[in-house]
């Protein structure tokens, strides 16, 4: 009898906190590969999002929404700081009043991608002058390490050096230390996340899922927007009917990775 009462109470107790779809983009360009989204496609995705009525958050507000918020929210993130963010993505976002976080590999700013797995030909990144202008216009910037390093291959001292060097460069260039982080390739270890947590409020990975109150704030899942090039799937997701599609994409990704 007692077990039945406890079960009933648990079933009727509301789950605290809201949910956040943290969208993941890289480059907005007419180029092949999963890290590029065509400009017209990006504009369609953002227009649909802006019309959806879903709450839009800055990354600063994500932890609070997950802990005590209500309902669905979305945060928009970009990895790597490609120049097309300034030229293509930001004008669209600004026109729709949508906030964005851009994670910068600080050694690569003013240059082009030069890391393992980089696109060929290499895509240019923004300049520090562009970063400063965008920061003044309301774009948020986070830490993507100094050299776009795979943290899973580094020891703890190297992780600390990579993250701190990026923090110091951003402090020097744009006047503040970043408090949000994204490990390159989405890879980090438990020990690396402990180092990251010392100076960053959040860290995002590449697990394909919606962030919830139970999510690790230093390994938050994201929604890879390459999977929503088909606007039918994107509209269904925004309408709250996308769980099965997201689940299918996770299974396909897991199967593909198991053969690598």
Region roles according to the model:
Residues 1-77, 83-86, 153-260:
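C-terminal active-site subregion of NodB/CE4 polysaccharide deacetylases
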Residues 5-11, 86-88, 116-136:
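Alpha-helical scaffolding within the catalytic cores
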Residues 14-17, 50-51, 91-98, 124-143, ...:
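Acidic (Asp/Glu)-rich catalytic clusters
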Residues 23-27, 140-148:
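Histidine-centered catalytic micro-motifs
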Residues 28-31, 108, 147-150:
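A short, flexible beta-alpha/helix-coil linker loop
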Residues 77-78, 142:
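Generic enzyme active-site microenvironment
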Residues 97-118:
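A short, conserved beta-to-alpha structural element at the edge of catalytic cores
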Residues 111-122, 148-156:
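Surface-exposed cleft-lining segments at the edges of enzyme active sites
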């Amino acid at each position: 009898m007692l077990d039945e009462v406890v079960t009933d109470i648990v079933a009727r107790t509301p789950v605290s906190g809201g949910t956040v779809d943290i969208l993941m983009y890289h480059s907005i360009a007419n180029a092949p590969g999963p890290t590029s989204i065509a400009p017209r496609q990006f504009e369609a995705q953002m227009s649909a999002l802006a019309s959806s009525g879903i709450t839009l958050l800055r990354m600063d507000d994500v932890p609070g929404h997950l802990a005590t918020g209500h309902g669905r929210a979305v945060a928009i993130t970009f990895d790597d700081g490609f120049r097309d963010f300034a030229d293509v993505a930001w004008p669209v976002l600004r026109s729709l009043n949508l906030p964005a976080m851009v994670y910068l590999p600080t050694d690569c700013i003013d240059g082009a991608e030069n890391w393992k797995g980089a696109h060929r030909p290499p895509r240019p990144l923004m300049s520090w002058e562009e970063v400063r202008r965008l920061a003044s216009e309301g774009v948020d910037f986070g830490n993507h390490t100094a050299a776009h390093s795979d943290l899973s291959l580094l020891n703890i001292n190297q992780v600390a050096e990579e993250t701190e060097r990026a923090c110091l460069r951003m402090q020097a260039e744009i006047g503040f230390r970043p408090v949000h982080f994204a490990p390159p390739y989405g890879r980090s270890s438990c020990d690396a996340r402990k180092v990251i947590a010392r100076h960053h409020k959040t860290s995002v990975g590449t697990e394909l899922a919606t962030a919830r109150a139970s999510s690790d704030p230093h390994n938050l899942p994201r929604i890879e927007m390459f999977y929503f090039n088909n606007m039918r799937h994107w509209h269904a997701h925004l309408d709250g009917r996308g769980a099965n599609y997201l689940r299918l994409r996770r299974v396909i990704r897991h199967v593909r990775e198991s053969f690598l």
